[in-house]
Regions:
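Catalytic, metal-anchored helix/loop core of enzyme active sites in primary metabolism
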Residues: 1-402
Length: 402
């Protein structure tokens, strides 16, 4: 019997690819979706999902326009901030795929965990800003979290393989990889003034503009180290990130096999395609792994030998991101991520230069507002106040002169 699934962030990069996979799935039936406003990007999916009952469109005007084109959904389209909560309450047994971007994604993450629902999680901010709340929920409720991120899927596969085949092992450390982004070969003296069209030319992945900029600064890789630390309960200093130019080796686990007294490593090697990670999450970790042949082993070894440390001069924001989390925890990351998002929006709108993304983030780390302890009671306050802070900061001129 097909399992019910709800896709949140259905018109974004991950959500759209998930729907492409679900069109031909015998394992799932799509019963609900949610997105902000871009209904025209979603309409092409309607013929494929005859069990789709409810649609959440956050923007009221866009919701009304959608209904005017699709009157059959007139009573089944919700808008406003409570729409997702209503949708999840209608299907308490459904699997939830959360591909919402930004700080807002933490709310449906917590709702799904509260409902004991399995959560396929592409919203990395949930761990970055809300890991303390997630851990509390996971102590009480029975839902499972399956990551949708090539690095964390890779780590999951490696850890599973090591625990299955090396019973007497001692974990040493983890590695996740980065491509280095679009500016990795640009002379260092030219990076600060990099143009939008150059920053958006990702060398290996096809992603949203926001994530592509985060790849150029490696803010996203800082987030992924934090996410891995919180997800697998491993200290940040035991997780390294390195440059793998082809993005074919996504992650690795280093361990000691005490049975043979050897230090070994297990790497995950797969194409640069987010559908690999999405498929693994949809299978809830049961998707069979590719069995390597001799050519694969040689290729992996070649890539591993070509790993390069992350240069602090070229990628200072990778280190600043980790510093912010170490200093301010989840609470400070609300503000850091909100400023990063607003700064990228300003850069893409040609309102600030590339190097000013770094200046804005340095400013928030050095001028963090007074932080109260994060709780469910003040969660929405954190989201709104960090949004206001970021908007006001980007409208100021003073920080740009620092």
């Amino acid at each position: 019997m097909a399992k019910q699934i709800i896709v949140l962030g259905a018109t974004g990069d991950i959500g759209s690819q998930a729907l492409e996979l679900l069109r031909y799935s015998f394992d799932y039936e799509l019963v609900g979706v949610a997105f902000k406003s871009n209904y025209s990007a979603f309409e092409k999916n309607l013929p494929y999902f005859d069990k789709l009952n409810y649609i959440v469109i956050e923007n009221k005007e866009a919701a009304d326009e959608f209904i005017s084109h699709h009157s059959a959904f007139a009573k089944n389209v919700f808008s406003g901030e409570n729409g997702i909560e209503k949708l999840l309450s209608y299907y308490p047994k459904a699997t939830i795929l959360n591909a919402i971007s930004g700080n807002d994604g933490i709310i449906p993450t917590l709702l799904a965990l509260e409902n004991d629902q399995d959560l396929l999680l592409a919203n990395k901010e949930s761990y970055v800003v809300g890991s303390s709340l997630m851990k509390e929920k996971m102590k009480t409720y029975k839902g499972h979290v399956y990551p949708i991120d090539s690095e964390h899927v890779g780590l999951s596969k490696c850890l599973r393989f090591v625990s299955k085949h090396y019973k007497d092992n001692e974990f040493r450390r983890m590695t996740i990889t980065a491509s280095g982004g679009a500016l990795r070969d640009l002379p260092l003296e030219k990076v600060a003034e990099a143009k939008k069209e150059d920053v958006l030319k990702h060398p290996t992945w096809k992603m949203s503009n926001k994530i592509t900029v985060d790849c150029a600064t490696l803010v996203n890789k800082g987030y992924e180290v934090i996410e891995a630390s919180e997800m697998f309960s491993v200290p940040v200093d035991m997780i390294e990130a390195v440059i793998c130019r082809d993005s074919l080796v996504h992650a690795g686990v280093y361990f000691t096999d005490w049975k043979k007294g050897e230090r070994l490593a297990c790497y995950e090697y797969s194409p640069c395609d987010m559908k690999v990670a999405i498929s693994f999450a949809l299978s809830k970790g049961k998707l069979r792994m590719h069995i390597c042949n001799i050519d694969d082993y040689e290729d992996v070894n070649r890539h591993v030998k070509e790993f390069v440390p992350i240069d602090k001069k070229r990628y200072p924001l990778f280190y600043l991101t980790k510093k912010c989390f170490a200093k301010y925890g989840n609470e400070g990351m609300f503000y850091y991520n909100a400023v990063d998002t607003k700064a990228i929006e300003a850069f893409l709108a040609d309102e600030i230069k590339f190097f000013e993304i770094q200046k804005a983030l340095e400013y928030v780390v050095d001028n963090m507002p007074r932080l109260e302890k994060l709780s469910e009671n003040n969660l929405k306050k954190f989201i709104s106040s960090s949004e206001i802070y970021a908007t006001e900061l980007l409208n100021k001129k003073s920080w740009r002169l620092l």
